[in-house]
Amino acid sequence: MLDTQSIIQAMAPELWLAASGLMLVLVGAIVGERFNSLSYKVGALVMFGAAALSAMHLQGGEAFNGLVKTTTFTNFTKVISFTLAGVAIFLSEGFLRRHEISRYEYPLLMVLASLGMGIILSANNLMTLYMGIETLSLSSYVLAAFHRDSARSSEAGLKYFVLGALASGILLYGASLVYGFTGTTSFDGLTLAGESVGAMFGMVLMIVGLAFKISAAPMHVWTPDVYEGAPTPVVAFFASAPKFASLVVFANVMFTLFGSVMDQWQLIVAIIAGLSMIVGSLGGLTQNNIKRLLAYSSIANVGYALVAVAAGQVLGAPALLTFSTIYVISSLGLFAGVLAMRRRGGMVENIQELGGLARRQPVFAIAMTVLVLSVAGLPPFGGFFGKYEVLRAGVEAELVPLAIILVIASVVSLGYYLRLLKVMWFDEPKETFERVDVTVLGTVVACAVIAGVVFMIFIGELGTGGWASYAASGLLP
């Protein structure tokens, strides 16, 4: 017999998102194009409502005979992810309207993708995990190709779909091997299952499939092309909410599902982390397209986050939450900034086009500078403290070579971060920027204040000694 109270405690946000998605479909089908403009505001409110429900049920629970299980670790991630998704929907309408592709299906797809995020974060069974991943992925493929009249957007969606399907197949095959050699798909059962060669091989395949979802090297090849070709508000969504959720799911799988065999996967995750940091820091140096540059930046930052995963549950989980929270907020702000910059009616795409931004729009340039320096991890901004926590976790876990790579990669990546700032502040303006939309400007400034200032001032309370440790405590037995 189903326990309604347990279901609500464990899955209130997902139930809300599923019901809201169905309502959006019905209203959109009945009202038609008249619902297009309102749908974005409704979609954003739906996401903020899901975040509020996650906060209300922060302690989590278990439902459906163990298929679903939530903790403070996953529910904290839901609060951040759903909030970022709501902001991403809110930012999208102006861009889509200018390109004449504003339709109610866009916020609907965002809601369904967020439903997938909620499911993977709540998963306590391999089948639930796969169902959530596919719900998120299928919505993401369509979002990447949402600008149907753009060849680049269609190409991005096709590449994402083909490579994503391959990664899903690898993940599913790995899960089937794990099930075949252990006899269970339950996370709780797998934690107690004995170690076997077949199950370890399945674990490696699952790591490969999940590494694609977080765009970690060497499974990163889709990221620059998709980031460049997909509509900018879609990329802002990809780089924030699903990125954060996927990183936490990766950590959750490693810490809970395979926590008892950490000695078998620690080196694999460390190698992926090292490759991601190297590829991300070096790859960005040659980029002229802003979105491709930020794609390589995201690959490097995934590598930094995986250092925390390789450090293990006790040391790594709080560091992962601290670093990832600051990074995704900064990343959303940066893409909102890219979304805001326009010249001659078109988007600013190349770094050289940023010339003179500080002279024309000083407030906007200051906010962008704070966000860039935060992502770069320079003190005294929030990103520095997040990266410091990851570095400390790596050193305490005796992953000294990985910590050295982290420091070197951070220094190398400064090359393209400082290049952005040099063009913005010191290059001569070539053309006048169009006026920045007040809503987008407010979002950029808010992200800069949160990521660059709030974390800088209150890092003692907000860091691994405070909320991050409390949220990560949900992983402890």
Curated annotation (Swiss-Prot):
E.C. designation(s): 7.1.1.-
Name of the top EC class for this enzyme: translocase
UniProt subcellular location: Cell inner membrane
Catalytic reaction(s) noted: a quinone + NADH + 5 H(+)(in) = a quinol + NAD(+) + 4 H(+)(out)
Any one of the GO CC terms: plasma membrane
Keyword Calcium assigned: no
Record's protein name: NADH-quinone oxidoreductase subunit N
Source species of the chain: Hyphomonas neptunium (strain ATCC 15444)
Lineage, opening ranks: Bacteria, Pseudomonadati, Pseudomonadota, Alphaproteobacteria, Hyphomonadales
Gene: nuoN
